[in-house]
């Protein structure tokens, strides 16, 4: 049982085009547990979850919000590159949908209750905005929270003079760590309201506070978050969100609203015989047995307005141009002409965006100069720090290497040079003088090595006279000419 006497929050995770799942959950909470929405202290959201949280807090039509998501996905699927096509402007589309859907006093209803997760560009920290001075500021906060770098553009939008990007980058599920926060996510995992996949894999991945279980269904959902699936698939996701919200309410004992259509007693005519009365009683007993099952089946259906809006969004218009464009020869010709039409469409869309960007050019150019300067300064400081750390060590290594390469093995007769070497090294003040002294000592050591006393045997250099029987006295030994004494 969910404790009604305590305070609680609701948090919607960012999920791209899968935000239609949040529409189903929000519709279920608003229909079957309105006190859960009305008495919530805060309702948070990041990226696409911020759009649903805004619609839920401000009282906007959820059916229209769900239809807008499907319309945007259909618009993205029309193009060759999908949402990456140059002519598809997601930021402009989101802004137009919010202007059309939100009421005029939406900022007054959202003040203090709605929390939108943003990522500050300057330091990458997460910021939650809860106060808005106008409807335009509330819409701009949603635009900042849904702005994915490179996917939506290169220059991030501004809110109150600060640049922000997608809130899911820093915190995709705000306040998930609190026990009194009801977390909603379209990925199966440990969120309170999420799909229940029949997978035995216990491993999970946490992406900026969002629990995602490792299974094939979640891989499919991740692939469709930024590249939308077909409209009927999105409608089924909305229905799944509605059923998952209903299961959460049942599990926590919050589904207390009876269905008035099922509570009405059967109408029995006043004039009937006993047999007809018995048949009616028997049918009433069967209805009582089937009532819980029918009640569950009725509750699992989407609300009429939401279902109608989703169906209208999924239906393709039956005009002549649509029929012709769906024909196979036309589609083949369109695909073959893409290399020629894509540059032209890119040039046209680039020109339109440039004209729309003109009012913001001075501010954006100033920001780009500041960012470029800060990046260059950071790179220079980092290079200086690395040079300061490695240069002394490299110099000391080179000096040690020179000593190891220059110092030969000293014989015992030249030990005096090795004993005298540290004295003049310590007494020298200049590195150049020390190196010069070291070269001089090296030359002396080499001369000492090559100047070796050669001891010849006495009989090797003796001048022998021709052998005669009378001359037997040996000659006195003399030093051979040409050899200096050592």
Swiss-Prot record:
Phenotype of gene-disrupted mutants: Mice show increased adipose mass and triacylglycerol deposition in multiple tissues. They accumulate large amounts of lipid in the heart, causing cardiac dysfunction and premature death. Conditional knockout in adipose cells results in a marked reduction in the levels and biosynthesis of fatty acid esters of hydroxy fatty acids (FAHFAs) and FAHFA-TGs.
Region (Disordered): 465-486
Residue stretches in coiled coil: none
GO MF annotation, one: mono-olein transacylation activity
Motif window: GXGXXG: 14-19
Biased composition (Pro residues): 477-486
GO biological process, one term: phototransduction, visible light
Residues at the catalytic site: 47, 166
Induction, as annotated: Transiently induced during fasting. cAMP and glucagon may not be involved in the induction during fasting. Induced by dexamethasone. Down-regulated by insulin, isoprotenerol and TNF-alfa. Expression is not affected by glucose and by growth hormone. Expression is reduced in fasted leptin deficient mouse (ob/ob), an obese mouse model. Expression is not affected in fed ob/ob mouse.
Associated pathway: Glycerolipid metabolism; triacylglycerol degradation
Membrane topology: Multi-pass membrane protein
Record's keyword terms, sorted: Cell membrane, Cytoplasm, Glycoprotein, Hydrolase, Isopeptide bond, Lipid degradation, Lipid droplet, Lipid metabolism, Membrane, Phosphoprotein, Signal-anchor, Transmembrane, Transmembrane helix, Ubl conjugation
Keyword Signal appears in the UniProt entry: no
Keyword Metal-binding: no
Domain of life: Eukaryota
All ranges on the Cytoplasmic side of the membrane: 1-8, 64-137, 353-486
Subcellular localization: Lipid droplet; Cell membrane; Cytoplasm
Transmembrane segments: 9-29, 43-63, 138-158, 332-352
Tissue specificity: Expressed at high levels in white and brown adipose tissue, and to a lesser degree in testis and cardiac muscle. Barely detected in liver, spleen, thymus, kidney, skeletal muscle, and brain. Among the white adipose depots, gonadal fat showed the highest level of expression compared with inguinal and renal white adipose tissues.
Biological role stated in the UniProt entry: Catalyzes the initial step in triglyceride hydrolysis in adipocyte and non-adipocyte lipid droplets. Exhibits a strong preference for the hydrolysis of long-chain fatty acid esters at the sn-2 position of the glycerol backbone and acts coordinately with LIPE/HLS and DGAT2 within the lipolytic cascade. Also possesses acylglycerol transacylase and phospholipase A2 activities. Transfers fatty acid from triglyceride to retinol, hydrolyzes retinylesters, and generates 1,3-diacylglycerol from triglycerides. Regulates adiposome size and may be involved in the degradation of adiposomes.
Protein name as catalogued: Patatin-like phospholipase domain-containing protein 2
Source species: Mus musculus
Gene: Pnpla2
């Amino acid at each position: 049982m969910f404790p009604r006497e305590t305070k609680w929050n609701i948090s919607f995770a960012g999920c791209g085009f899968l935000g239609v799942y949040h529409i189903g959950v929000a519709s279920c909470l608003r229909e079957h547990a309105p006190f859960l929405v009305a008495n919530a202290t805060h309702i948070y959201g990041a990226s696409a979850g911020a759009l649903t949280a805004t619609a839920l807090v401000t009282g906007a039509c959820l059916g229209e919000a769900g239809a807008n998501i499907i319309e945007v996905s259909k618009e993205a699927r029309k193009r060759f590159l999908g949402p990456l096509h140059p002519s598809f402007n997601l930021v402009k589309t989101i802004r137009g949908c919010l202007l059309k859907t939100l009421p005029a006093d939406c900022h007054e209803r959202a003040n203090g209750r709605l929390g939108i997760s943003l990522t500050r560009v300057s330091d990458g920290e997460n910021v939650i905005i809860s106060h808005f001075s106008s409807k335009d500021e509330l819409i701009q906060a949603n635009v900042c929270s849904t702005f994915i770098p490179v996917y939506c553009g290169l220059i991030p939008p501004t809110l109150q003079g600060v640049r922000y990007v997608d809130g899911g980058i820093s915190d995709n599920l705000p306040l998930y760590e609190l026990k009194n926060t009801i977390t909603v996510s379209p990925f199966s995992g440990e969120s309170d309201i999420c799909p229940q996949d029949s997978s035995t894999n216990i491993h999970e991945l946490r992406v900026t506070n969002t629990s995602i279980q490792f299974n094939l269904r979640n891989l499919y959902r991740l692939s469709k978050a930024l590249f939308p699936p077909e409209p009927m698939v999105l409608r089924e996701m909305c229905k799944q969100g509605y059923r998952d919200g209903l299961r959460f309410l049942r599990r926590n004992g919050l589904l207390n609203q009876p269905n008035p259509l099922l509570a009405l007693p059967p109408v029995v005519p006043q004039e009937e015989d006993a047999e007809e009365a018995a048949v009616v009683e028997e049918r009433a007993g069967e209805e009582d047995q089937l009532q819980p099952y029918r009640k569950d089946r009725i509750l699992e259906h989407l609300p009429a307005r939401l279902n109608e809006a989703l169906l209208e969004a999924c239906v393709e218009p039956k005009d002549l141009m649509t029929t012709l464009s769906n024909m196979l020869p036309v589609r083949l010709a369109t695909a073959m002409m893409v290399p020629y039409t894509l540059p032209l469409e890119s040039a046209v869309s680039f020109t339109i965006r440039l004209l729309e960007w003109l009012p913001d050019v001075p501010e954006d150019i100033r920001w780009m100069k500041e960012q470029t300067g800060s990046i260059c300064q950071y790179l220079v400081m980092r290079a200086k720090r690395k040079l300061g750390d490695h240069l002394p060590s490299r110099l000391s290594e080179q000096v040690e290497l020179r000593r190891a390469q220059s110092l030969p093995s000293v014989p015992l007769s030249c030990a005096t040079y090795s004993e005298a070497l540290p004295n003049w090294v310590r007494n020298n003040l200049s590195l150049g003088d020390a190196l010069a002294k070291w070269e001089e000592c090296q030359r002396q050591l080499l001369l000492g090595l090559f100047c070796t006393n050669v001891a010849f045997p006495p009989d090797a250099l003796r001048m022998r006279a021709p052998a005669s029987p009378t001359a037997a006295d040996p000659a006195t030994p003399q030093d051979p000419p040409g050899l200096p004494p050592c």
